[in-house]
Amino acid sequence: MTYTLPGSPVLLRHFTLDDCTVLEANPATMDSDRFSFFGLPVPGRMRRRVESGEAHPKPGEVHGLLVVEAEGVCIGFVSWHPQNYGPINAPTANFGIGLIPSARGKGYGTEAQKVLVDYLFQTTTVNRVEASTDVENIAEQRSLEKAGLLREGVVRGAHYREGRYNDMALYALTRPDYEQARAASSATKITTGFSASR
């Protein structure tokens, strides 16, 4: 089973063991992706999740992991988990993405995030999706903006990477914003006064 949007060059699908091989051969390193390197990966962790079925999200779940596929091959993954604000269980879906080095800079990340946002609003009851990235990661900030998310601000000192605490840029889209953009046009981008700049 796959999920995509009309005209998108990427699709989202469940993991296979072959996908694990691709991702294991392309781990994040300080040289390949300093914004995604948080230490050495646990060998076989993803394989165990795939074999147990844990890596396959069930419909409506506010946590999950899917493969990003382009041109018939695994080029990375997207993941999401619940983020609650307050004591009432009304989760936000906080998501992230990881692409293998050869897939970066081709627009696949933007497309995958567009498809994931649509998937989450179509298959879960979340009222908000959000993502954050290091304030130095200008490429991902632009990708999130192109995917239709709004920059809401900076979360100071929230992210530990490269031996220090770093600020994170927070992006989000609410269900009403999503529905308004979808009604206007599938290509509509909602904008604010914020932009991804240094």
Give, region by region, the residue ranges found by the protein language model.
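GNAT-family acyltransferases
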Residues: M1-S102, Y165-R198
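Amphipathic alpha-helical recognition patches that constitute DNA-binding helices
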Residues: L11, V22, P41, N94, ...
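Conserved hydrophobic/aromatic "anchor" residues
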Residues: F15, Y119-F121, L149
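Positions that flank functional sites
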Residues: V42, E136, H159
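Conserved catalytic-core motifs of GNAT/GCN5-like acyltransferases
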Residues: P82, E130-S132, L150-D167
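Active-site acidic-Proline motif in GNAT/NAT acetyltransferases
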Residues: I97-S102, K106, Q122, V135-E136
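Conserved acetyl-CoA-binding loop-helix of GNAT-fold acetyltransferases
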Residues: G105-Y119, I138-K146
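A beta-strand edge to alpha-helix "cap/lid" segment located at domain peripheries
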Residues: Q122, N127-R128
